[in-house]
Amino acid sequence: MSDYKIWVDADACPNPIKEILFRAAERKALPLVLVANQMIRVPPSPYINQIRVGAGFDVADQYIVDHVEPTHLVITADIPLAALIIEKGALALNPRGELYTVDNIKQKLTMRDFMEDLRGSGVHTGGPDSFSQADKQAFANSLDKWLVRV
């Protein structure tokens, strides 16, 4: 089981998702590493660690990319980070329960870039819906599917 690990792009990860991950790490005796450029409160546990990286653009992302392995799962809403994780053969799951895959990541990147271009030209595109109980449940279900394989 020591080959498996969960990484969290923790700066923007919703607290309810962190709580689910804390419980899963304890239940499965599975290493969980939260990477952020600020201190993140984590419960005392031999399985849960927090890595604080320096401030700067994508510093936490790069730390995760540098350390992830194919048997690992990365929790992130950052689509470019998810693409890098997939290139390294690992899995990426967003906090709303959607698994990023080789089959869908190019489309996700294209849509992200398109929306960014629209915003850059002054078009108001809105943001994602508020994080909901349904999102939390979808994440828990997706995580459980991965944990069954561990």
From Swiss-Prot:
Protein's name according to its UniProt entry: UPF0178 protein Sbal_1771
Q: Which family does it belong to?
A: Belongs to the UPF0178 family.
Cross-referenced NCBIfam families: PRK00124.1 (NF001095)
Q: List the disulfide bonds.
A: none
| Annotated TM spans | none
Instruction: Name the PANTHER family for this protein.
Output: UPF0178 PROTEIN YAII
UniProt xrefs under HAMAP family: UPF0178
